[in-house]
């Protein structure tokens, strides 16, 4: 392979490091922050040079789709298969949860974190501390399987009357539903009807 410049080597080594530790490559923004480049176009330029020199392969149709080209120096890298899962922003009543207008971005998720059909999976960014006693923290990403039913004790994503998604523990009581926070300082939400849009099946947290 052709020789790399100092900056290209920094970027290449950073990509390898992230792949080794996380199982998937970093974003362009993360690469720039790691090597001190503020311009994403400059990072893209270096990635193009790395691709031309045969060190990486990229898929322009997918975010973060950077593949380390195997050679004698990196045969020991185990790059885990990833799926690109929609990250849902605003949830609109009457619109399927994964409708285009609800999707903010796609996130590369290690395949082992899902256990069902990929098309049924979406991600919500957690805001707030209502579920901290279940180990779900502000800023976490919850991995959700689309479904409209739930069993008592399930952690679900439900639609509020304000058309916002909320993550709570689900309970069906005699004449009402209870959405229970996992935070002893917060009160439960009682509803006559509840719109379940998914069950939390996993959690992803940036270290």
From Swiss-Prot:
Enzyme class per UniProt: hydrolase
Gene3D superfamilies named among the record's database cross-references: Umud Fragment, subunit A, Winged helix-like DNA-binding domain superfamily/Winged helix DNA-binding domain
DNA-binding region of this protein: 28-48
Substrates-to-products reaction catalysed: Hydrolysis of Ala-|-Gly bond in repressor LexA
Disulfide feature: none
Family: Belongs to the peptidase S24 family.
The protein's name in its UniProt record: LexA repressor
Organism of origin: Staphylococcus aureus (strain NCTC 8325 / PS 47)
